[in-house]
Each structure stands twice: as structure tokens, then as C-alpha cells.
A protein has these predicted regions:
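H-loop/switch region of ABC-family ATPase nucleotide-binding domains
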Residues: 203-204
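Conserved ABC transporter NBD signature motif
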Residues: 61-68, 226-228
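The feature captures the beta-strand-to-loop junction immediately N-terminal to the Walker
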Residues: 38-40
């Protein structure tokens, strides 16, 4: 489904501010796989997502999505087949448009449908009802008036409406309060499972990284230093994961946000 081969990205090359953000990273993702990605700040997690989406072009290497080499394909073209949620709930939807208009835009996936049929509107309401937030009764409400959790749940729905080939979740619950974050995370696992989506999820919650999906990778210095799945992953604890990081990278993970990040009652043992 997704094959990344030896990609490199250097920012400000040849200057005092030179930063090797991606350091020969390779990754193969199978169809329908749900991978959680962890790592300290500056490890290259969001940079990897930006490379996949085409926010910038990599300096070297290739990115192949569903058999098509997209390494040099512009970002707006890739956006038609890649869904992405950001940490900021304000991104991913149009605040000046109402809920229905945002859904119409998402359903068009790059094309504007000026009029929605009664059947389409009914379908939108049915999908919104699944979120359990009462948004199905607020179709004409401006998105800018929604709470952060409501807006992130709506954005999740919008990003998956057209069944993207790849779904990227960039700490999409980090800015929400614990209760809302738990609800959005539960919705995420349900939608990914029901739609059989291929998904990469960045998280700073190490327990979530082990509980959700079927594979966990850890990044450091712009590369993958640890990759676990199957029985090995099932047996891992957070402490064991930290030990494996130290063994793989040769250094201690010193990041308060990761070490202290816990969300109670995280949905466990999510499988496709």
C-alpha cells in the first residue's frame, strides 16, 4: 500500500541552522494496517507526514502509494487520496461554512458540489448521528462555532468520507480535554475498522501506541529505531518500550510530555 524508500530531507543545508529532518528513512505499510508512531519532539514524525503528503519534496528517495510513485506529485493532488487530521482542531474544516457545506466539500474531494440532494443530506445526518454529538441537528450551524472536540470529530468524518487510500492522524486528540480525547479516539478506531482504512497515527501517549492498531514504530533523529508488531508487541509494556528505545538508539528518552502522557480507559486491543 505505502512504500517509503530511503527518503532524506535536510532543512537549511550548508548553513549553521542545517537540520537533517529525515535520515534515510524506509517504511513499508501493508493495506489495512494501523500503525502508531511515537518519538520525542524533533524525532521527525510530523516531517514524515509532511513528506508523505507532499508539503515539501524530499531531497532523495521515493514514496510509492498504492503502486503509484507520488514522490514528485504536488500536495493538492495527493490530498485527493490522503486524509489527514492535525493536532489543531481548527485545521481541516472551513470555519466560515456550515456543517452541511463542509460535508459537501469533503464528499466532492477536490470538486465543489453547489447543491446537495435530499438523499445526500439524509446520508450526512445519518453519519453525523454516529458521532453521538448531536451535530445531525445542527447542519446549518457554522463550523467556527463548534467546540474543539466537535470540530475534530467532524474533521475525522470529512477526512474519511471518500475512503482515502491513506489516513494520517497527527496527534489529533492532543489538544482536547481527556474526556473528549477518549471519545474522538474511540470514534477513530471504529471508523478505521469499519472502513478498513490504512492508517498512521502519531501519538505522545505511549500506552495508546501499544493498545491501538496492530503495529508500533518509534522514531529518533529522522529515522525508525524500533518497529514492533504481533506477539512481541502484545507483550510490551511502556517500561519495556522505553528499554527497547534505549537499546536501539543508545540513549535515554528524556521527554516529559511522552513520559507523563496517559489517557485512562484507552480502547484496548483494537484489531481490524
Amino acid at each position: 500500500m505505502l512504500e517509503i524508500r530511503d527518503i532524506w530531507k535536510v532543512f537549511n543545508p550548508g548553513t549553521m541552522d542545517e537540520k537533517i529532518a529525515l535520515n534515510g528513512l524506509s517504511l513499508k505499510v501493508e493495506d489495512g494496517e494501523f500503525i502508531s508512531i511515537i518519538g520525542a519532539n524533533g524525532a521527525g514524525k510530523s516531517t514524515l507526514f509532511n513528506a508523505i503528503c507532499g508539503t515539501f519534496l524530499v531531497d532523495r528517495g521515493s514514496i510509492v502509494l498504492d503502486g503509484t510513485d507520488v514522490t514528485r506529485v504536488p500536495e493538492h493532488i495527493r490530498a485527493k487520496v490522503i486524509g489527514r487530521l492535525f493536532q489543531d482542531p481548527m485545521k481541516g474544516s472551513a470555519p466560515g461554512m456550515n456543517i452541511e457545506e463542509n460535508l459537501i466539500l469533503a464528499a466532492g474531494r477536490g470538486g465543489w458540489l453547489s447543491i446537495s440532494s435530499p438523499d445526500e443530506r439524509a446520508g450526512f445526518r445519518d453519519r453525523l448521528a454516529l458521532l453521538g454529538m448531536g451535530l445531525e441537528d445542527r447542519m446549518k450551524a457554522p463550523v467556527g462555532l463548534l467546540s474543539g472536540g466537535q470540530r475534530q470529530a467532524l474533521t475525522l468524518m470529512m477526512a474519511t468520507m471518500a475512503h482515502p487510500k491513506l489516513l494520517l492522524l497527527d496527534e489529533h486528540t492532543a489538544a482536547l480535554d481527556p474526556g473528549t480525547a477518549e471519545k474522538v479516539l474511540k470514534l477513530t478506531t471504529e471508523i478505521v475498522a469499519e472502513e478498513h482504512l490504512t492508517c498512521l497515527m502519531i501519538t505522545h501517549n505511549m500506552q495508546s501506541a501499544l493498545d491501538l492498531g496492530d503495529r508500533t514504530i518509534m522514531m529518533d533523529g529522522g529515522n525508525i529505531v524500533f518497529d514492533t508488531r504481533g506477539e512481541e508487541r502484545k507483550m510490551l509494556t511502556v517500561e519495556g518500550l522505553l528499554d527497547r528505545f534505549r537499546a536501539s538508539s543508545g540513549k535515554k528518552l528524556d521527554n516529559d510530555r511522552m513520559l507523563l502522557s496517559t489517557v485512562k480507559d484507552t480502547p484496548r486491543n483494537f484489531k481490524h
